[in-house]
Amino acid sequence: MTAKIKVLQVIPKLGYGGAETGCYDLGHFLAENDCKSYIITSGGELIKYVRKDKVKVIKLPVQSKNPIMILLNSFLITLIILFFNINIVHVRSRAPAWSCLISCFLTRRKMVTTFHGTYNFKNAIKKIYNSVMLKSKLIIAGSNFIFNHINENYIDKLDPTNKLMVIFRGINLDYYHEKNISVFKKNKLFNLWGLSENKFKILLPGRLTSWKGQDKFIESLNILVEDYNNYRFEAIILGSDQGRNVYKKKLQNLSQRYNLNQKIFFIDHCKDMPLAYSLSDVVVSSSVEPEAFGRVAVEAQAMQKPIIASNIGGSKETIIDKKTGFLYKYDDPRELAKVLNSVMELDKDTLNLIGNEGRKNVSKKFDVDKMCQTTFTEYKKLLKN
């Protein structure tokens, strides 16, 4: 009988982001496939949903970028690796990656990294800091965009003996499914948000930050009214400001200046995202900087909603333009308004057809089981070498 593979995942915080949900999904997949699954994290809202009988969660301050804490964490992670006899350490962020690099060196364990973002670098020191994500035996890029970004910017940091590959992020298609939506809950949320009947609902999900382009989205809604005389919509900007109070105030002031405060609804959080998607007629991703993957676009398609997204980053891979959604020139509110107006003129059957094609697209390429199975297969290959 072969021994169970023991995998330790390390992530700063187990919240609702793409990296975090990927960690959560993989942790449970491993437990259900005869592995021992462990997660080190500092905390996060997703912890309460972890099946404690399947996945062991260990809390450490791995969110800290303080060099002293990074060294302390490396000592503690080393003890955890030895105590639980961990085979593979899979890390998803830079600060804890430095801790894990030291721990894996001391314990001679295999390290895996997932390169989740573009990790901006303005100087050589920052680039060296980022390069820790390339020090593992297996480097996973969540999209072709990230794969190309690594090759274009870090080719001098890549060790040819390490494996760099694309494993597309996946989502839970059973969770993101229209069939699970309760009419009662849908009506309740509709009333809670104060939405109106017979208005075209435009949903923009994502935390409030300038690179997500919420300000450009509001400008596009003003153009929709001014240039197209189109008032037939309500827009929901769904996301926490995460302490960015000044930016949120800017968005609210912009909404008032354009006399759109009766048409734009700012919602801080919705724990049931499939329910939120179900209220919409179209979903928008207005990012002005590249998304590493573009989870919103994939979730929207899974929920059979047309998606409009800026033509940069991962969205170009997840959306089939003019079939499952529409791409527009990023940072261009005028073009976004034009696309919005065109989508609003489509009949219900055409919108449903686009939604159905979106679901097919996600089922084929971005299923969470496929992501987890591919990762698990690579783990086994790594342990054989």
What is the predicted function of each stretch?
Residues F105, M111-N144, N148, L158:
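A conserved, positively charged/aromatic
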Residues S136-V166, I171-Y176:
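A short, active-site helix/loop in glycosyltransferases that binds the activated sugar's phosphate group
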Residues D321-K322, F326-R334, S342-K348:
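Conserved acidic donor-binding segment of nucleotide-sugar-dependent glycosyltransferases
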Residues E20-D25, F200, L204, T209-E226, ...:
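A conserved mid-protein helix/loop that constitutes part of the nucleotide-sugar donor-binding site
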Residues P306-A309, I319:
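Short hydrophobic beta-strand element within catalytic cores of glycosyltransferases
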Residues V91-A97, F115:
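Short His-centered aromatic/hydrophobic patch
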Residues K188-N191, E335, S342, D349-K365, ...:
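A short, well-ordered alpha-helix in the C-terminal region of glycosyltransferases
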Residues G243-K248, N261-C270, A276, F326-L327:
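Active-site donor-binding acidic/aromatic loop of nucleotide-activated sugar
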